[in-house]
């Protein structure tokens, strides 16, 4: 019987060897598919009979034939999945297919390179920036030279992954170009030097437009004439022009402008720079110009490192540190810090100026804007100097305010009646700035607040216009002027002038017509000769009789009890008719730092003694001061009387008619009206021999027509504030320290004047 298994196996092996040798190299199959399929197909057909001799011989022959391609084949085998070790026949077929694919891909690559070179040769466009393409968008001609940006493939043998990527890129080159980010085709930036040269003229132009006439010439170097001989352009491309203020001729260079300016100058007044053609008629202009040549900037800002050549530029620069816009348009929302820019706005649009603010943000109705005039900065309504420090000129604000003080009394002499609110507000700008620890000069036309310690009566009597109601200085506005450099952030939005006018209107409304007549008569009856005699007499008394501070109590107990018995309805009202000769004027040598209260009471007695001699004549006589005729004539006030147990009763408390008599900001004139009104209603108990008697009871109560009978008014002489409530007055006086009235009695902090104390009380919590 024939063995079919042996025969079939032998025939199959021979057929398989013949099939592999003839057709394996010509059949194209995927490596994985060929590997798996051949492995699966051949594994079940494996015969248990060993038949590996034919395969080993065939593999040895193939290795000898392709020995020169062994190195690239090793690389491909390392990057591709290796076939199974059990199937050597599948490995042989895989190697043959991979070699054929590699050859085809190399041919495709060569054709691609040739086509790309030919395309680049026929369709080459110049690269660079296209002005029609917006920055950041793809260039429309980018696809023509985009291929040049990629490295060309090398003809050397490459891996399978690289070849596959090149083939994919060839088939979808347009898609890749659409997906790749666009190249940066924005134009190159200008050099830093040119940009700085464009910005510098604009900056200098801004300084010229905002500063004074002293800055109309920009900085030029000593050895470079391009800035003065060539036109200057700003960053917007606008050329700088130089316009003659005399004839209106416009020049485009500084040299031409200076040459034209010389024609308007007198030959004997021409001042020329030794280093350039600059000419001027003013010495300070030439001085500033020479400082620019030498690069000297002596003026420096105290808040930053800015330096400049003159004070005007520094004042203009300091406005950049302020948040107050002093100039506002009445017809629109335009606001600026510089008057020059404000005038340009008003001229351009035909608008009207609004309320001008001071440097601290306080409205100043006394200033007006001369829109079409040549004045730099605002001007005052009365034609006098400017009372605001924000005009941009070189002079300081303090000198302007002191000059206005000399003009104000002349205008107020012609206004005996109550002025309107605008005039009252405008009068606030005319008071000098006097420190709280210094005595004003005797010839000062207007006196400050009663915080000045040593004032002579001569300074009061030398001002015939003092009793005018327009001179009643509101305390808050005056104190702000004394401390105009302080930052009062909570009070920036307050119209302080309106508040002051309301206070004055309320005080003037309480005055009787007879008081106004008396004040007018007092102005008319004073003469220069009498003032000189009175000045000499009072100066002699002030030197001979210094203030006695050795008294233990400010008020005698008997007199205080008598005052309570005679005035039970007003136990806390202090009648200012109560001074004696024992505490006369404060010495004019300013030896004692009294805050003005003794001066006020002493002047009261002198004025009252003159009224007792002639009741119709309300002026200070030159006779010796008689004894007091008040119920508490023996009272000796102390500087620190508010620290005693009777602080609320012993402090300076006045009625409304006393406030009317306060014709100046000092307390001396304030008490003069009180004494004149009270002495005219006295019962004749005032005699020159009763100075030591403290039991006079003739003038028991004030007249029924006086405001003291209607209601009590308490006044703090240090802050010049009135209180209608004794509790509020006592609380306020509790903040004044005994040794220093402007030192907080609660925490001990030293404050800068009454406004500083008020700000301290408002900002800090005290237990």
Swiss-Prot record:
The keyword Zinc-finger applies. GO terms for cellular component: nucleus. Residues 39-51 have a biased composition (Polar residues). Residues 386-397 have a biased composition (Gly residues). Residues 528-537 have a biased composition (Acidic residues). GO terms for molecular function: DNA binding; zinc ion binding. This is Protein hunchback. One of its GO terms (biological process) is segmentation. It is found in: Nucleus. Coiled coil: none annotated. It comes from the Eukaryota. Gap class segmentation protein that controls development of head structures. Residues 105-117, 518-527, 661-704 have a biased composition (Low complexity). The keyword Repeat applies. Belongs to the hunchback C2H2-type zinc-finger protein family. A zinc finger (C2H2-type) spans 242-264, 271-293, 299-321, 327-351, 714-736, 742-766. Pfam families: zf-C2H2. InterPro entries: Znf_C2H2_sf (IPR036236), Znf_C2H2_type (IPR013087). Keywords: Developmental protein, DNA-binding, Gap protein, Metal-binding, Nucleus, Repeat, Zinc, Zinc-finger. Residues 30-51, 105-127, 174-212, 357-424, 518-570, 610-704 are annotated as: Disordered. Residues 200-212 have a biased composition (Basic and acidic residues).
């Amino acid at each position: 019987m024939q063995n079919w298994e042996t025969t079939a196996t032998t025939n199959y092996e021979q057929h398989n060897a013949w099939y592999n040798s003839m057709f394996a190299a010509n059949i194209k199959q995927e490596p994985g598919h060929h590997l798996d399929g051949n492995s699966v197909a051949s594994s079940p057909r494996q015969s248990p009979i060993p038949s590996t001799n034919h395969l080993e011989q065939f593999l040895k022959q193939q290795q000898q034939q392709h020995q020169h391609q062994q190195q690239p084949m090793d690389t491909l085998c390392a990057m591709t999945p290796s076939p199974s070790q059990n199937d050597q026949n599948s490995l042989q077929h895989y190697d043959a297919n991979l070699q054929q694919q590699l050859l085809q891909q190399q041919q495709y690559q060569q054709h691609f390179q040739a086509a790309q070179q030919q395309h680049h040769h026929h369709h080459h466009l110049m690269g660079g920036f296209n002005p029609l393409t917006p920055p950041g968008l793809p260039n429309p001609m980018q696809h023509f030279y985009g291929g040049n940006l990629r490295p060309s493939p090398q003809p050397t043998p490459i891996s399978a992954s690289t070849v596959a990527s090149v083939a994919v890129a060839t088939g979808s080159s347009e898609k890749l170009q659409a997906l790749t980010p666009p190249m940066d085709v924005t134009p190159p930036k200008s050099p830093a030097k040119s940009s700085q040269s464009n910005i510098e003229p604009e900056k200098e132009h801004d300084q010229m437009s905002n500063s004074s006439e002293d800055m109309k010439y920009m900085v030029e170097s000593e050895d470079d004439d391009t800035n003065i001989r060539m036109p200057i352009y700003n960053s917007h491309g606008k050329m700088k022009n130089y316009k003659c203020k005399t004839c209106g001729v416009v020049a485009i260079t500084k040299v031409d402008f200076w040459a034209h300016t010389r024609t308007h100058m007198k030959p004997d007044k021409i001042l020329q720079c030794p280093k350039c053609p600059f000419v001027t008629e003013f010495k300070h202009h030439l001085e500033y110009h020479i400082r620019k040549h030498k690069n000297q900037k002596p003026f420096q800002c105290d808040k930053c490192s800015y330096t400049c050549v003159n004070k005007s530029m520094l004042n203009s620069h300091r406005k950049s540190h302020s948040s107050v816009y002093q100039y506002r348009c009445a017809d629109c929302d335009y606001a600026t810090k510089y008057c020059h820019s404000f005038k340009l706005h008003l001229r351009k649009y035909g608008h009207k100026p609004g309320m001008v603010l001071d440097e601290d943000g306080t409205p100043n109705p006394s200033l007006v804007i001369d829109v079409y005039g040549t004045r730099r900065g605002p001007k005052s309504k009365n034609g006098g100097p400017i009372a605001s420090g924000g005009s941009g000129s070189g002079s300081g604000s303090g000198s302007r305010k002191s000059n206005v003080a000399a003009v104000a009394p002349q205008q107020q002499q012609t206004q005996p009646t109550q002025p309107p609110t605008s005039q009252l507000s405008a009068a606030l700008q005319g008071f000098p700035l006097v420190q709280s620890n210094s005595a004003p000069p005797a010839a000062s036309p207007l006196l400050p607040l009663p915080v000045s310690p040593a004032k002579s009566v001569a300074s009061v009597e030398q001002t015939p216009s003092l009793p005018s109601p327009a001179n009643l200085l509101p305390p808050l506005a005056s104190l702000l002027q004394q401390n105009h450099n302080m930052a009062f952030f909570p009070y920036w939005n307050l119209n302080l002038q309106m508040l002051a006018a309301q206070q004055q209107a309320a005080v003037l409304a309480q005055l009787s017509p007879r008081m106004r007549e008396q004040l007018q008569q007092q102005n008319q009856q004073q003469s220069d000769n009498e003032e000189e005699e009175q000045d000499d007499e009072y100066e002699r008394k002030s030197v001979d009789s210094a203030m006695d501070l050795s008294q233990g109590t400010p008020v005698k107990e008997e007199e205080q009890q008598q005052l309570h018995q005679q005035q039970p309805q007003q136990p806390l009202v202090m009648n200012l008719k109560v001074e004696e000769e024992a505490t006369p004027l404060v010495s004019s040598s300013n030896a004692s730092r009294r805050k003005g209260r003794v001066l006020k009471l002493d002047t009261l007695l002198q004025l009252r003694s003159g009224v007792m001699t002639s009741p119709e004549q309300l002026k200070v006589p030159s006779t010796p001061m008689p004894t007091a005729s008040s119920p508490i004539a023996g009272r000796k006030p102390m500087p620190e009387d508010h620290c005693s147990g009777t602080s609320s009763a012993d402090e300076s408390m006045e009625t409304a008619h006393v406030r009317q008599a306060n014709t100046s900001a000092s307390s001396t004139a304030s008490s003069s009206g009180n004494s004149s009104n009270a002495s005219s209603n006295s019962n004749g108990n005032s005699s020159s021999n009763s100075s030591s008697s403290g039991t006079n009871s003739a003038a028991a109560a004030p007249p029924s027509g006086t405001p003291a009978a209607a209601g009590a008014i308490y006044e703090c002489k240090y802050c010049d504030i009135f209180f209608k409530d004794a509790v509020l007055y006592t609380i306020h006086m509790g903040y004044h320290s005994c040794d220093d009235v402007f030192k907080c009695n609660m925490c001990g902090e030293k404050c800068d004047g009454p406004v500083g104390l008020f700000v301290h009380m408002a900002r800090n919590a005290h237990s």
